[in-house]
Amino acid sequence: MKAVVLTLAVLFLTGSQARHFWQQDEPQSPWDRVKDLATVYVDVVKDGGRDYVAQFESSALGKQLNLKLLDNWDSLSSTVAKLREQIGPVTQEFWDNLEKETEVLRQEMNKDLEEVKKKVQPYLDEFQSKWHEEVELYRQKVAPLGAELREGARQKLQELQEKLSPLGEELRDRARTHVDALRAQLAPYGEQLRERLAARLQALKEGGGAALTEYRAKASEHLSALREKAKPALEDLRQGLLPVLENFRVSLLAAVDEATKKLNSQ
């Protein structure tokens, strides 16, 4: 029940992006989520791709073509792993700098969210209490009908459904009334939170124009440094791919020639 109430509060205030604020555990930072998702994605693609290559090479067609795709795949995986190892520290430095530059703004927004949370908590408690009462009332009204279903014959099923239908409609209407009341109570706080965020961003833009310019300059500088530091690693990747692609091309041409000879000899 509490999960329903908390979800409604999130939707009324700031949308789905505020879901971590209402949780007790400290949420993972956006930078850590991006890095973890990227790592998991690359690992899944790499492992899954190798399985497909291995299955193809073990098939009759793969053995006949003898393209040595698995060896090429391992060489490519080694080259990509080397690239990730070289770029990793540079990428980490970029995320750390960006997180540091936005620390003040995030702290101010956390304070605003905490203040709004304290103000709306009584409304959430009241809504939870009313909803619990409505559900309990519905359960009490339905209980005799459930006993009637167990005791009655099959022909009474339609009659029972007709009796249940208005009760369900009544519960939905009551729930809708409570939800509308809660939305009306929380709307000023959601608007207040949005206004505070807009005001802080506007103040940062007007009174701290130099700070925004500095943020953009630093971000541009970090990206330029990332591109420069990544160039050697990307060049190593390109050089590592060339022999792999050439080996694949030669193997494929040889397989095609062999197949052509077999067809001509038949």
Curated annotation (Swiss-Prot):
Post-translational modification: Glycosylated. Palmitoylated.
Classification via Pfam families: Apolipoprotein (PF01442)
Localization per record: Secreted
Main location: secreted
Transmembrane segment boundaries: none
InterPro entries: ApoA_E, Apolipoprotein_A1/A4/E
Positions of post-translational Methionine sulfoxide modification: 109
Keywords: Cholesterol metabolism, Glycoprotein, HDL, Lipid metabolism, Lipid transport, Lipoprotein, Oxidation, Palmitate, Phosphoprotein, Repeat, Secreted, Signal, Steroid metabolism, Sterol metabolism, Transport
Sequence repeats (start-end): 67-88, 89-110, 111-121, 122-143, 144-165, 166-187, 188-209, 210-231, 232-242, 243-266
Segments of this protein annotated with the region 10 X approximate tandem repeats: 67-266
Role description: Participates in the reverse transport of cholesterol from tissues to the liver for excretion by promoting cholesterol efflux from tissues and by acting as a cofactor for the lecithin cholesterol acyltransferase (LCAT). As part of the SPAP complex, activates spermatozoa motility.
Family statement drawn from the similarity comment of this UniProt entry: Belongs to the apolipoprotein A1/A4/E family.
Complex formation: Homodimer. Interacts with APOA1BP and CLU. Component of a sperm activating protein complex (SPAP), consisting of APOA1, an immunoglobulin heavy chain, an immunoglobulin light chain and albumin. Interacts with NDRG1. Interacts with SCGB3A2. Interacts with NAXE and YJEFN3.
The protein's name in its UniProt record: Apolipoprotein A-I
Protein source organism: Leptonychotes weddellii (Weddell seal)
Lineage: Eukaryota, Metazoa, Chordata, Craniata, Vertebrata
UniProt gene name: APOA1
